[in-house]
Amino acid sequence: MARLCAFLMILVMMSYYWSACSLGCDLPHTYNLGNKRALTVLEEMRRLPPLSCLKDRKDFGFPLEKVDNQQIQKAQAILVLRDLTQQILNLFTSKDLSATWNATLLDSFCNDLHQQLNDLKACVMQEPPLTQEDSLLAVRTYFHRITVYLRKKKHSLCAWEVIRAEVWRALSSSTNLLARLSEEKE
């Protein structure tokens, strides 16, 4: 029984290895599932009705043209997605959120992001990209604007609700980018 279990574990690890290491570094299926789960949990984290924070809405200038660029190479896209995921994780693990979110949902969301980040890091190590600094700078500048906004709004519940919705849109864009890259591969 122990040998069978060990054999099955090796098969699982090899299937993960081959999916991550194949030509073009295909992200494991778990990445897409984690992304969908993160979007669902982020939606569940809503604490206020959308209309209650209209006065706090702001256009943070999500760099969609940099993230979903038709000319972006897969290796560059992986790097941009990794940075986007890392910035979201940094935002939702900051000390300034205290009791803003339900702890169980926040943990679930952050765990999904950690898993996605690990998948993306494995791909970056497999296929070092030709860095596209302007894309990375655009993502970092976007998150800097979000951080400044939160500070200016003193991390209010409405400000965090606006950010939650903004991050949901950013994650949705990353899902669209991955879908497009997958279609191009086929």
From Swiss-Prot:
Q: Where in the cell is it found?
A: Secreted
List the Gene3D superfamilies. Answer: 1.20.1250.10
The secretion signal range is 1-24
Task: Tell me the superkingdom of the source.
Answer: Eukaryota
GO MF annotations, alphabetized = cytokine activity; cytokine receptor binding
Among its keywords, does the record have Glycoprotein? yes
Q: Which residues are glycosylated?
A: 102
Q: Name one GO biological process term.
A: defense response to virus
Cellular component terms (Gene Ontology): extracellular space
- Keyword Secreted listed? The answer is yes
Q: List the disulfide bonds.
A: 25-123, 53-158
Keyword terms: Antiviral defense, Cytokine, Disulfide bond, Glycoprotein, Secreted, Signal
* Family note: Belongs to the alpha/beta interferon family.
Q: PANTHER family in the record, alphabetically?
A: INTERFERON ALPHA-5 (PTHR11691:SF60), TYPE I INTERFERON (PTHR11691)
Query: What biological function has been recorded for the protein in this entry?
Result: Produced by macrophages, IFN-alpha have antiviral activities. Interferon stimulates the production of two enzymes: a protein kinase and an oligoadenylate synthetase.
What's this protein's name? Interferon alpha-4
Origin species: Mus musculus (Mouse)
